Regions:
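Structural motif
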Residues: 2-12, 49-56, 96-103, 150-158
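Multi-bladed beta-propeller domains
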Residues: 6, 12-30, 57-74, 105-128, ...
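Generic domain-boundary/flexible-linker signal
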Residues: 22, 44, 52-54, 98, ...
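Active-site proximal loops enriched in glycine and acidic residues that flank catalytic Cys/His/Asp
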Residues: 37, 45-46, 58, 71, ...
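N-terminal leader/targeting helix
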Residues: 38-68
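Loop/turn-rich, solvent-exposed surfaces of beta-rich toroidal or solenoidal domains
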Residues: 51, 68-112
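Blade-level signature of beta-propeller repeat domains, shared across WD40, Kelch, NHL, RCC1
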Residues: 127-166
């Protein structure tokens, strides 16, 4: 399509000095990844002959498994909360231009919505405002970036201390 930019990404790990390179995901579709621990990376991708989704990769191996099937169904800005029991994620704007940050409880598969944030039409393309949810050091608060009324981009603080009780 005219005007559309296309790119492919592969996930490669290596030592801090650039040695010991390993192509962990050669699909060309790797996006939004986070280390869960020193051996595992969670990433949105579409491995060959598989459906798109969040996959957990074991570094330096071909081991991977799709997680969050049927719950975390869209690419987003994922991160593990302290303790790795919860994943914090968001969505891109839906048809109504609403973005949805949420928590996902890994063991139970429960999804906890954290709010609905309007992304006005002028915040599109390179000028978009992704929520990019991030947590406080103790994991009790989340901050998201989102336009608010006519005030432009704002940071919104969400208390999640009660959300994490299963």
């Amino acid at each position: 399509q005219s005007g559309k930019v296309s790119f492919k990404t592969r996930m490669i790990t290596g030592s801090i000095d650039g040695s010991d390179l390993y192509i962990l995901d050669p699909s060309g579709a790797t996006s939004h990844f986070i280390w869960r621990d020193p051996q595992h990376i969670l990433a949105w991708t579409q491995p060959k002959d598989k459906r798109p989704g969040f996959y957990l990769f074991k570094d330096k191996t071909s081991e991977m498994e799709q997680i969050t099937v049927g719950v975390m169904t869209e690419n987003g800005h994922c991160t593990y909360l302290p303790g790795n029991e919860w994943i914090l994620n968001d969505t891109y704007p839906d048809k109504q231009r609403i973005q949805h940050p949420y928590l996902f409880h890994v063991k139970s598969g429960k999804k906890v919505p954290l709010g609905d944030f309007l992304s006005p039409a002028q915040y599109a393309g390179e000028w978009r405002c992704d929520t990019h949810p991030r947590f406080s050091n103790d994991g009790s608060m989340v901050v998201v970036d989102s336009p608010y009324e006519d005030k432009g981009r704002q940071l919104h603080l969400i208390d999640i201390s009660n959300c994490k009780k299963i």
